[in-house]
């Protein structure tokens, strides 16, 4: 198993604003420049799936495993002999909203998918989270 996390605390957004940003999957490409498109049919809730196409990559099916409004969500992407879990946690603190993103890869070929996909995601988290905060602050 391989896991990495990134956290930042900010007063620029509320948990409701950041939640609204993430729950609107079909508009992720407006603030995430690494995504060509994302399509969720149905609501942002446990058990639903969405399709995401990273720029320069193939379509990826993502399943929502846990969804707790304004607090956290966990999704999974299934690769050949591996799974990548992406957990987003939103915690109110006296210093502001703590935003945490945890990427975990498990499975027989996890080392391969870490190299091909997960490491790039983790390396871009600081900039990506700043873009999320910027976009959510306008909601």
Model segments located where?
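Secreted/surface-exposed cysteine- and glycine-rich disulfide frameworks
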Residues: 47-52
């Amino acid at each position: 198993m391989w896991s990495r996390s990134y956290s930042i605390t900010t007063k620029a957004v509320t948990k409701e604003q950041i939640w609204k940003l993430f729950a609107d999957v079909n508009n992720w490409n407006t603030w995430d420049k690494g995504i060509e498109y994302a399509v969720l049919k149905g609501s942002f809730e446990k058990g639903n799936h969405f399709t995401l196409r990273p720029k320069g990559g193939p379509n990826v099916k993502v399943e929502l495993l846990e969804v707790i409004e304004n607090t956290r969500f966990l999704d999974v992407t299934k690769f050949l002999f591996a799974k990548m879990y992406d957990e987003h946690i939103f915690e109110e603190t006296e210093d502001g909203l703590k935003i945490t993103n945890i990427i975990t890869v498990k499975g027989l070929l996890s080392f391969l998918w870490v190299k091909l996909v997960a490491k790039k995601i983790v390396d871009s988290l600081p900039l990506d989270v700043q873009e999320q905060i910027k976009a959510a602050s306008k909601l």
